[in-house]
Amino acid sequence: MESTPPYHRSNTKSASRLQDSSNPPNLSLDLVLSSPNTPNPSSPVPLRDILLLPPSPLRKSRTRLSDRLEMTSEDAMAVVRKRGKGKGGQKSLLASPRNPRRSRRRSEAVEEKEANLVIEEIVKLPPRKRKTNGRPKKDKQSSAPPLCSSSDLPNTCQSDLNLIGEIISDLVMWRDVAKSTLWFGFGCLSFLSSCFAKGVNFSVFSAVSNLGLVLLCGSFLSNTLCQRKNEDTKRAFHVSEDDVLRSARRVLPATNFFISKTSELFSGEPSMTLKVTPFLLLGAEYGHLITLWRLSAFGFFLSFTIPKLYSCYTHQISQKVERVKTRIGEAWGVCSHKKILAGSAVTAFWNLTSIRTRIFAVFIILVIFRYRRQNLQLTPEEVEPVENEQEEETLPQEEETVPQEEETVPQEEEQTQPSEERALVVVVAET
């Protein structure tokens, strides 16, 4: 037998091998079909819809309750579908080359479950209120500037007036010598310089006009020198309610003080009427000679001199006034022609004065009569407190009254002496 050469043998083997390798296995990354014994997962939803998962519900807005409920329902359906697929195709997933992708999807499913649980807890909780960046109303009310109530306003006004009164009294009474000397010297210098100045005529209209010219020149120069680049921001000056209230609070104490003093002066009391009437009569009679500048000058000098002198020499002045009163009373008591003197004085005044002066003289006489009547007659309401006070006095106070009684004895002796002199005068007149 002839044996075949080796190269022929190799050719036949290569041909068979080529035939076997003509149909190579189609390897692909697709899923390996499961065995026919394993049942396919029955799901009416296609695979595309399952893979196209909805976005994470945490990214959606949580403002509306209806949107939250819809998201939770959709997530629950997706989780159920994935669970069914996992039960049926677990073996295929193990045999599939896409295990990393499936594990990734499983982790996403676990995250979605946790998100669903969080959403359910959020739905169960009550809706939260919106937080405002601003402070609460109580803090805002507390931070606002407190306004003076109507009840605290009189107290503040009274405190301001008391403070002003203390400052003026300290200056006038020379308690602080340095300040009083400074103000007195400055006032004297200004008034004396104005007295020696000649040809100076002050007018309110001219002063306002000059001030307006100065302001106009200043505004023009500032506008020309300080020009801005096409941006002229003009400040709009306007008066607001706060400005009006602030100015009213400043002016209110002085206004209330003026009203109270005016009502006190014109109250109609006899004592106050006798004090105010002479000044008003002098002002009405010689008002044309009094100017504002002279009045301020006299008021300045008198305010810095008279109060201090009166406080230093009060006792001496009161003693001299009492002596003058006693002498006048003694002379009037000794006079035997009282009616003649009174009648002559009344007729002279009536003939030498005008009708206006007569009317005011009658008015002053009526006020004097009422004042005397008010001082002499005591009402029962005033007598009862005096009696109660006398009963409540202690023994030391009674001891203090003993020297006072000893002092009244010489006064009674002085009163008896004019009566004896009157008797002697009457006897001499009869003789």
Curated annotation (Swiss-Prot):
It is a multi-pass membrane protein. InterPro entries: Reticulon, RTNLB17/18/21. The keyword Transmembrane helix applies. Residues 126-138 have a biased composition (Basic residues). Residues 1-110, 126-152, 382-422 are annotated as: Disordered. One of its GO terms (cellular component) is endoplasmic reticulum membrane. Residues 12-26, 142-152 have a biased composition (Polar residues). The chain crosses the membrane at residues 177-197, 202-222, 286-306, 349-369. Residues 168-355 form the Reticulon domain. Pfam families: Reticulon. Its main location: endoplasmic reticulum. Residues 382-415 have a biased composition (Acidic residues). It is found in: Endoplasmic reticulum membrane. Keywords: Endoplasmic reticulum, Membrane, Transmembrane, Transmembrane helix. This is Reticulon-like protein B17. It comes from Arabidopsis thaliana (Mouse-ear cress). The gene is RTNLB17.
